Amino acid sequence: MAKRTKKVGIVGKYGTRYGASLRKMAKKLEVAQHSRYTCSFCGKEAMKRKATGIWNCAKCHKVVAGGAYVYGTVTAATVRSTIRRLRDLKE
C-alpha cells in the first residue's frame, strides 16, 4: 500500500501528480466508492461496491445494480418517486 497523509487521504497514492483540484475531485469519488452503504433489503450497513455499478451486500448476499461510484443515484430516486406517484394515481 502507498503511504497516505492525514491531509490528502486516499489520493495520497497520486503524490504531486495531476494537480490539487483534480485530486480533490478524485478523493470525493474514491471515498464514496469505497465506503459501505445501508442495504435496502436487510437494513444493515454492508453494501459494498463489487465492480462498476454492481453492489453486493455482505450480510444478505443480494446483488444490486446501482451507480458507478455510489449505491443510489439521483436519477434512480427520481424514477422511484415517479413510479410511486403513478401507482398512487392509478389506485
UniProtKB/Swiss-Prot annotation:
InterPro entries: Ribosomal_eL37/eL43, Ribosomal_eL43, Ribosomal_zn-bd. Belongs to the eukaryotic ribosomal protein eL43 family. One of its GO terms (biological process) is translation. Disulfide bonds: none annotated. GO terms for cellular component: cytosolic large ribosomal subunit. The keyword Oxidoreductase does not apply. The gene is rpl-37A. This is Large ribosomal subunit protein eL43. A zinc finger (C4-type) spans 39-60. One of its GO terms (molecular function) is zinc ion binding. Keywords: Metal-binding, Ribonucleoprotein, Ribosomal protein, Zinc, Zinc-finger.
